[in-house]
């Protein structure tokens, strides 16, 4: 393939003696990456005009997301003969110091330099789908080819389609969008499904993420769109698909732009279109921008959206591999899965299956949040446990507090207690504990979190996002939310817990689609593992975390108040008086809205 043969030429291109790259992911841009980039360009131009830089000068570049969103804007400096240095939380006013101290003076600007834990964090990951995040320009096909991009496709085009499918089966790859179905067997079903006289068969990328805590697919598509495109072409050749569609949300503007750019570049290199790589295989891809709805990510609803219909889920079977888009066999995997396919073809199925455990091979990208020191996107071997991620990679629970609850799987996931922290992050291990991997986000919370409050958010989100087609979701979720409101506001009864559990179990087995089935996991696992906390809300009318403010009237213990005034400023209604000049604070409950701001502000536990 001519496009891949340019790798050696690309490697030899002069990129300047010193190279500076800036993270231009969505979070990076939100933190001011464009301003930082412009400041670098401006300062480099001035330094070059004054002959202050070396003869090689500096080259500028952009890179995609590497997952460390809390550290943006990230800047990497590559000086020949030295280890690369990453700078974090860079602002425009730091640019001149980085240039003068590091590039001209030869000394790292330590104030902004990433600490050792940043590098250790990366070493503890196994990055496959995120391999090129932070390393290459996502808008430059030559940089992707330079690191081995499209070599997996080159290898695939020299194989029989059926052999590619067997290779994917041997790798142990499973879908990374929730259910974890074995990818190779899904491909085989699509490849063997009867077609029309024209052999019409579709292949798709599910790049839609409705879970508010999940952004893995967006980051993969933004950070290395060619990796997704290459995987999709390989899959298309394996099942002999006639057309490819990348379905993503219209509000993923950066991902959409970069995907379209990648498709254009691939066509120009002969990697898409007629007779790909000199073979008789012809195939093309287009991007479909869908609506911003949680239900839009469900496979049958997604296909209905592409067909121009309202995105309602359909009962299965028949499955989409037999009768999908416009009634034709359709293969659908998410963006992370397609990015992994290209790596497997390039490095081999044995390489991929060497990672993971007996339940699941390979790796998974997780979106991490909560009361942990480091959050963002990280990719781990499937055998990694919650405890290893929280303590070894994420720096443990912040502010030296204790882990109380792990919320795994986002709004369709569930809760686990600290005693389950040694559970591996694979499909079966999670399922055995009553939670699903779902869209692979997990949050670790300390004792300031309330399980009932967290469950209210999950159920409330799912209630708002339900398509309303089936009664279990449309009516059941509202009933559950009302019961949770009663418990959190002092109207709950002990018998409500059994009613809640029974109702959730009914929805779990009768909902039309997978999203409905999992919409109640937060309540089921909450009652299973944190029943005592539910009972304290009902019997004692107390919330240990003081999150369920409907249970409380706030009182200042005068003997503990030091009159520091810390509680006055955060009060949004001016309900607090005193608190200064040795006069204890006082809360006017007629003005208090139970927002909990004063409780959180008091360092002396004087507000109860």
List where the protein language model places each region.
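Flexible inter-domain linker/hinge segments
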Residues: 110-170, 333-348
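C-terminal accessory/binding modules appended to enzymatic or scaffolding proteins
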Residues: 360-374, 386, 544-582, 586-589, ...
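Hydrophobic alpha-helical positions that pack around
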Residues: 256-382, 394
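Ferredoxin-type iron-sulfur electron-transfer modules in oxidoreductases and energy-metabolism complexes
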Residues: 2-18, 33-60, 75-106, 151-170, ...
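Gly-rich Lys/Arg/Thr-decorated short loops/hinges at beta-loop-alpha junctions or inter-strand turns
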Residues: 136-138, 144-151, 206-217, 320-325, ...
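Histidine-anchored nucleotide/phosphate-binding helix
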Residues: 224-238
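Accessory "access/gating" subregions that flank catalytic or transport cores
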Residues: 154-197, 353-354, 359, 367, ...
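Short amphipathic, charge-patterned alpha-helical segments
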Residues: 231-233, 382-398
């Amino acid at each position: 393939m001519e496009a891949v043969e340019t790798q050696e030429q690309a490697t030899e291109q002069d990129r300047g003696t010193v190279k500076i790259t800036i993270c231009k992911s969505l979070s990076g841009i939100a933190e001011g990456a464009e301003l930082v980039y412009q400041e670098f360009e401006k300062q480099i131009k001035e330094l070059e005009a004054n002959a202050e830089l070396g003869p090689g000068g500096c080259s500028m570049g952009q890179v995609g997301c590497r997952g460390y969103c809390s550290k943006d804007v990230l800047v990497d400096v590559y000086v020949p003969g030295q280890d690369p240095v990453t700078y974090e939380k860079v602002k425009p006013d730091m640019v001149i110091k980085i240039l003068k101290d590091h590039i001209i003076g030869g000394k790292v600007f330590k104030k902004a330099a990433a600490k050792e834990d940043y590098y250790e964090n990366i070493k503890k990951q196994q990055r496959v789908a995120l391999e090129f995040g932070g390393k290459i320009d996502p808008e430059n096909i030559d940089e992707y080819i330079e690191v081995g991009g499209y070599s997996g496709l080159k290898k695939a085009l020299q194989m029989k389609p059926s052999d590619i499918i067997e290779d994917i089966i041997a790798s142990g790859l499973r879908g990374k969008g929730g259910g974890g179905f074995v990818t190779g067997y899904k491909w085989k079903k699509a490849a063997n499904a009867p077609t029309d006289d024209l052999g019409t068969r579709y292949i798709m990328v599910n790049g839609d993420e409705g879970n508010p805590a999940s952004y893995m697919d967006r980051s993969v598509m933004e950070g290395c769109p060619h990796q997704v495109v290459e995987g999709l072409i390989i899959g298309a050749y394996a099942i002999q698909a006639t057309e490819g569609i990348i379905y993503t949300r219209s509000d993923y503007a950066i991902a959409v732009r970069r995907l379209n750019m990648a498709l254009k570049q691939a066509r120009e290199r002969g990697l898409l279109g007629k007779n790909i790589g000199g073979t008789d295989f012809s195939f093309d891809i287009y991007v479909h921008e869908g609506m911003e709805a949680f239900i839009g990510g469900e496979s049958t609803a997604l296909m209905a959206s592409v067909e121009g219909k309202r995105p309602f889920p359909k009962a299965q079977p028949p499955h989409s591999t037999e009768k999908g888009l416009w009634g034709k066999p359709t293969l659908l995997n998410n963006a992370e899965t397609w990015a992994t396919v290209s790596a497997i073809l390039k490095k081999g199925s044995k390489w991929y299956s060497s990672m993971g455990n007996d339940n699941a091979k390979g790796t998974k990208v997780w979106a991490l949040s909560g009361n942990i020191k480091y959050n963002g996107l990280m990719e781990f071997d499937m055998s990694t446990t919650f405890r290893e991620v929280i303590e070894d990679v994420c720096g443990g629970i912040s502010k030296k507090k204790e882990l109380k609850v792990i919320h795994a799987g986002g709004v369709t996931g569930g809760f686990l207690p600290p005693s389950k922290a040694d559970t591996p992050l694979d499909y079966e291990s999670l399922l055995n504990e009553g939670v699903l991997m779902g869209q692979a986000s997990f949050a670790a919370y300390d004792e300031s979190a309330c399980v009932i409050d967290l469950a209210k958010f999950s159920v409330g989100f799912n209630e708002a996002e339900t398509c309303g087609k089936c009664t279990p979701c449309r009516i059941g979720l509202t009933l559950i939310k009302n019961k949770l409101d009663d418990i959190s506001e002092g109207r709950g009864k002990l018998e409500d817990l059994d009613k809640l559990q029974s109702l959730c179990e009914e929805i779990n087995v009768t909902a039309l689609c997978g999203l409905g089935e999992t919409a109640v996991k937060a309540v089921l696992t909450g009652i299973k593992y944190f029943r005592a906390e539910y009972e304290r809300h009902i019997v004692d009318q107390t919330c240990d975390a003081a999150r369920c403010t409907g249970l409380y009237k706030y009182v200042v213990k005068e003997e503990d108040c030091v009159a520091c005034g810390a509680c006055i400023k955060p009060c949004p209604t001016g309900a607090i008086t005193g608190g200064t000049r040795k006069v204890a604070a006082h809360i006017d409950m007629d003005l208090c809205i139970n927002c909990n701001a004063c409780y959180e502000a008091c360092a002396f536990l004087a507000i109860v």
